[in-house]
Amino acid sequence: VRDAYIAKPENCVYECATNEYCNKLCTDNGAESGYCQWVGRYGNACXCIKLPDRVPIRVWGKCHG
């Protein structure tokens, strides 16, 4: 498990406005919790706490969406 920005298959973050949206997205994918990181490295993006290794995360490189 790891704390990370959850990613779509094309290495793009899930953009967000609320913590509730991200918490649901993250917990639905097996994380302990989630939050909306405002004005972070990838803009307003969902970050997950203790996200399982099987779930894709945002890695270095371009978003191909």
From Swiss-Prot:
GO molecular function: sodium channel inhibitor activity; toxin activity
Keywords, comma-separated and alphabetical: Disulfide bond, Ion channel impairing toxin, Neurotoxin, Secreted, Toxin, Voltage-gated sodium channel impairing toxin
Keyword Phosphoprotein tagged: no
Residue span, LCN-type CS-alpha/beta domain: 2-64
GO process terms (BP): defense response
Main location: secreted
Any single Pfam family the record assigns to this protein: Toxin_3
Localization: Secreted
Cross-referenced Gene3D superfamilies: Knottin, scorpion toxin-like
Domain of life: Eukaryota
SUPFAM superfamilies: Scorpion toxin-like (SSF57095)
InterPro entries reported for this sequence: LCN-type_CS_alpha_beta_dom (IPR044062), Scorpion_toxin-like (IPR003614), Scorpion_toxin-like_sf (IPR036574), Scorpion_toxinL (IPR018218), Scorpion_toxinL/defensin (IPR002061)
Gene Ontology annotations for the cellular component aspect, listed alphabetically: extracellular region
Tissue specificity statement from the Swiss-Prot or TrEMBL entry: Expressed by the venom gland.
Cysteines joined through disulfide linkages: C12-C63, C16-C36, C22-C46, C26-C48
Family to which the UniProt record says this protein belongs: Belongs to the long (4 C-C) scorpion toxin superfamily. Sodium channel inhibitor family. Alpha subfamily.
Role this protein plays: Binds to sodium channels (Nav) and inhibits the inactivation of the activated channels, thereby blocking neuronal transmission.
Protein's name in the database: Neurotoxin BmK-M3
Species this protein is from: Olivierus martensii
The organism's taxonomic lineage, starting at the top: Eukaryota, Metazoa, Ecdysozoa, Arthropoda, Chelicerata
